[in-house]
Amino acid sequence: TPFCISNSVDWLYTRICVDGEELEISKADISEFVRELDMQNGVLTRSFIWNLSNGKKLKISFERILSMTDVQVGAQKVKLTALNFDGDVEIKSGLDFSNPHCMQKMNMWEIKDILYKSGKNAFAGIEGETLHTQQRVFSACAIKADVNEFDNVKEEDRKSVV
């Protein structure tokens, strides 16, 4: 039988929503897509313009960094620029253990602990254990934002913290 490792925590979990429309990149109207990989420095950048159904345009840039010396450390920076509108953009970012197993099509993790703190020094942490082999993984992140309002770090569905 083929061997398939359970998906671990998704530490890049990000959802972006404008006026009730959530970005689903595989279905969205996207233009000016650019992706660059800098292997020497461990940096992946991706940017594009999301053309919303109501005519609004939002430029989105992701910068993902993996430490070249401390392999368990990674970071993601998301930059949002409203190109033709003023208004609110909702972004959810966090840690998610709800990815299904590739062959069994079910989640193979049980959440053991979730830690979070809202506000200026927001923090999220999640610990999961595989259902069959009891392997444990803990993932944590600091959440920083340069915006007017930043709150509501919370637990969602006992499978993720966003």
Regions found by a protein language model. Name each.
Residues 1-162:
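Beta-sandwich/jelly-roll carbohydrate-recognition scaffolds of carbohydrate-active enzymes
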